[in-house]
Amino acid sequence: MLKIKRDDEIIVIAGKDKGKRGSVQQVLDNGRLIVAGVNMVKKHVKANPNRGTQGGIVEQEASLNASNVAIWNPKTQKADRVGFRFEDGKKVRFFKSNGEAL
């Protein structure tokens, strides 16, 4: 189970986009994430007149490995680690630095 979920604010800690922050748009099954505005690639799209799509070069987000990102803690303004604990019989994620629930 990944500790990062959709709509979490993250920061990239390794790779060409190190230091960039963004929101998780999608979590893929293979341990990869798609983050808004991070790891942008140019994709060549072929025109399809049947669908009415125009061809050209489109810039879009590519996936990142989850090990290259850390969750962003807004209180401390730093990257943080996530832990799990049970509160009232429910599994809750929390920041390891200050113990605050996500």
Curated annotation (Swiss-Prot):
Q: Which GO terms describe its cellular component?
A: ribonucleoprotein complex; ribosome
Q: What name does UniProt use for this protein? A: Large ribosomal subunit protein uL24
Question: Would you identify the family this protein belongs to, as annotated?
Answer: Belongs to the universal ribosomal protein uL24 family.
Disulphide connectivity of cysteines = none
GO biological process terms, semicolon-separated: translation
User: Which InterPro entries does the UniProt record give?
Assistant: KOW, Rib_uL2_dom2, Ribosomal_uL24, Ribosomal_uL24_CS, Ribosomal_uL24_KOW, Translation_prot_SH3-like_sf
Q: Name the domain of life this protein comes from.
A: Bacteria
Q: Organism source for this protein?
A: Alcanivorax borkumensis (strain ATCC 700651 / DSM 11573 / NCIMB 13689 / SK2)
Q: Where are the transmembrane segments?
A: none
Q: Which gene encodes it?
A: rplX
Tell whether rRNA-binding is among the UniProt keywords. Answer: yes
| Keywords of this entry | Ribonucleoprotein, Ribosomal protein, RNA-binding, rRNA-binding
- Source organism phylogeny: Bacteria, Pseudomonadati, Pseudomonadota, Gammaproteobacteria, Oceanospirillales
KW Transmembrane helix (keyword) present: no
Picking any one GO molecular function of the record gives: structural constituent of ribosome
Q: Which residues form a coiled coil?
A: none
Q: How does it assemble?
A: Part of the 50S ribosomal subunit.
Described by its record, this protein's role is as follows: One of two assembly initiator proteins, it binds directly to the 5'-end of the 23S rRNA, where it nucleates assembly of the 50S subunit.
Q: Which HAMAP family does the record match to this protein?
A: Ribosomal_uL24_B
